[in-house]
């Protein structure tokens, strides 16, 4: 039986945050029951996987990243479209952000129901959206792909994959083949 508590209307207590190294280049920013954020530190830049709920929350991720590197945060990957995972993307703009990356089906979800999802999640997760006023609006990808895109962060290969519909129609996973690390978004809980 799963005993983990997930974020909800009744969940108003702060969760302890952990920032754990998974491999040479991969880190996990987690708080029990909250959406997680992946961090990939390449030779020349940083990738964030799932941006948090608000730009204010993103600052907490940035602070942890800055404890281990001063490289620019050039990429934010949206593993799927749920407001609690993506609306913090604008918080990375001052850190060197060049691209917000999502599958094309995720882009379609934002277009079709992004505003509705944002309003619903803000109402359902008050703790995660305490700084709702910091959100400038919907998060739109600047780079989309249909099945797969490969980025090289210096010598580190990063594959961003859309294997098909799962948790949403736009699910994306980030695979580091050299290190055998997979960031799966909400495909696995």
Predicted segments, located by residue:
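Short acidic, Pro/Gly- and aromatic-enriched capping/linker segments at domain boundaries
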Residues: 6-21
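Short Gly/Pro-enriched turn/cap motifs at secondary-structure boundaries
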Residues: 17-18, 29-30, 133-136, 140-142, ...
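Loop/turn elements at helix/coil->beta-strand transitions in domains of secreted/extracellular proteins
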Residues: 45, 71-74, 96-98, 156-158, ...
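Active-site HxH/HxHxD metal-binding segment of metal-dependent hydrolases
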Residues: 63-143, 150, 169
């Amino acid at each position: 039986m799963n005993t983990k508590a997930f974020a909800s209307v009744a969940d108003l207590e702060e969760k302890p945050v952990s920032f754990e190294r998974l491999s040479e280049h991969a880190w996990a920013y987690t708080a029990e029951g909250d959406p997680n954020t992946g961090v990939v530190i390449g030779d020349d830049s940083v990738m964030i996987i799932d941006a948090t709920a608000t730009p204010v929350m993103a600052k907490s991720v940035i602070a942890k990243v800055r404890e281990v590197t001063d490289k620019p945060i050039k990429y934010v990957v949206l593993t799927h479209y749920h407001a609690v995972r993506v609306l913090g993307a604008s918080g990375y703009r001052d850190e060197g952000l060049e691209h917000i990356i999502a599958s094309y089906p995720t882009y379609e979800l934002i277009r079709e129901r992004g505003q509705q999802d944002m309003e619903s999640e803000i109402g359902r997760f008050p703790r995660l959206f305490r700084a709702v006023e910091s959100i400038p609006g919907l998060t739109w990808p600047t780079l989309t792909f249909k099945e797969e895109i490969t980025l090289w962060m210096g010598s580190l290969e990063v594959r961003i994959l859309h294997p098909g519909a799962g948790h949403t129609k736009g699910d994306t996973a980030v695979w580091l083949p050299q290190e055998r690390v997979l960031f799966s978004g909400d495909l696995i809980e």
